[in-house]
Amino acid sequence: GKTYRAYECDNALPFGYTYDSYIPREKYEKMSVIEKQQALLQGVVLDESSLPETVLTLNDREVPFKIITGKGCQEKDGKLIVTKENAQARLVFDGLDESEIYLITEGVNYEVLSPRAMISDKKWKNMSIYEQNQVFHENSRWRYWKESQKAYIDVTGKFLNKTISIYTDKYNAYSGKHNFLCNAGYSRMGKNSLTLTFQNTGVYSYDDLKVVCQPVTKVDKQVKKLGEESLQDVKVEDHELTGKISVSKPKALVIALPYSTGFTAYVDGKKTDIKQANTMYMALNLAH
C-alpha cells in the first residue's frame, strides 16, 4: 500500500483574524502565484478600503537549473522527448536555505510519438527494408487509433511524491489547464534536485519551466501579527455566528467563511457591510 505523511501546522490562522492595511484587488490579480501567497500574509485583498495600502516585501527568487536526462529522454528546443515509459530527467539547482521550493510550468502540452519517432536514427539504420516498411505502414495509420489524450509526470525528491496530470483537448475531461505549480516542500539546508518521471512516451512541450525558492523566515512573525487581535468566543448556532473582538486601531476582520451575499453582519449592534476579501472570504471593517 501507499505511505502517507500527516503534518501539523504550527502557524494556523484563527477563524477570524485582522489586517491593518489592504492590497487593491486589481494590483493583486497582476501578481504571480508565488507573489500572491506572500501578499496574503501582509495585507487583505479588497476592491477598495479606507485602510492604508500595504507596502509589500517580496523575497521569492527564481534559481537557475540544469536538466540532466536519463535513458529514453532527450531535451530539444524547449521539449522533452520521451521514448521509454518511466524515463527520467533531473533538475539540478542550488536552492536557498530555509525555503519552500516550487516547480512552475507554463504552456505545457503533450503529444504521442509516432512509431517512427520511437526509433532512434542509429537503430533505424540497422533495420532491414522489410522492418522499415512495417514501421512506415504503422506510421501511416497510428493517428487513427492512438490520440494524444493524457499523460502523467511524477515529481519526486526527499519526502516528495507528486503527480502532474496533463490532459489535452482530445480528452473528454479536458479543462484547458496548461499551467502547473508543484510545491516541492520545505528544505532547511537548501534542496538541490528534483526528479521528473514520465509515465508515458511522447513529446512534452512547455513555454516556460522554472524553479522558485520562497524563504519562509518571515512567516512566523507575519502569522503572529494577523492573529494578535482575533475573533474570540466564536459560537455557531441557529444559522448565526457570533464572536468578540477588540482592536487597537482600524482594521479589517477576515472571517474564514466563503463569501456570500446571503449573510448579514452586525458590529456592536449596527448593520455593517460585508466585503469580499482575499478573493474567497468575508471581511468586516472594525473601528478603534
Give the positions of each predicted feature:
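Aromatic/acidic, Gly/Pro-rich catalytic loop(s) in extracytoplasmic/lumenal soluble domains
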Residues: G1-E35
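Active-site-proximal, structured, solvent-exposed surfaces of multi-pass membrane proteins
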Residues: L13, S50-H288
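A short, charged
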Residues: I34-N59
